[in-house]
Amino acid sequence: QKCCTGKKGSCSGRACKNLRCCA
């Protein structure tokens, strides 16, 4: 699943919390 949305890399979903794009 794609957790990164937009150029800012906003996070959607709890599992995406640990991804770098969500930082």
Curated annotation (Swiss-Prot):
Localization in the cell: Secreted
Keyword Secreted included in the entry's annotation: yes
Family per record: Belongs to the conotoxin M superfamily.
Organism encoding this protein: Conus striolatus (Cone snail)
Designated name of the protein: Mu-conotoxin-like SxIIIB
Keywords of the record: Amidation, Disulfide bond, Ion channel impairing toxin, Neurotoxin, Pyrrolidone carboxylic acid, Secreted, Toxin, Voltage-gated sodium channel impairing toxin
Single GO molecular function: toxin activity
This protein's GO CC annotations: extracellular region
Modified residues (Pyrrolidone carboxylic acid): Q1
Functional summary from the UniProt entry: Mu-conotoxins block voltage-gated sodium channels (Nav).
Keyword Disulfide bond among UniProt keywords: yes
Location (main, coarse): secreted
Domain notes: The cysteine framework is III (CC-C-C-CC).
Residues modified to Alanine amide: A23
Disulfide bonds: C3-C16, C4-C21, C11-C22
Tissue expression pattern: Expressed by the venom duct.
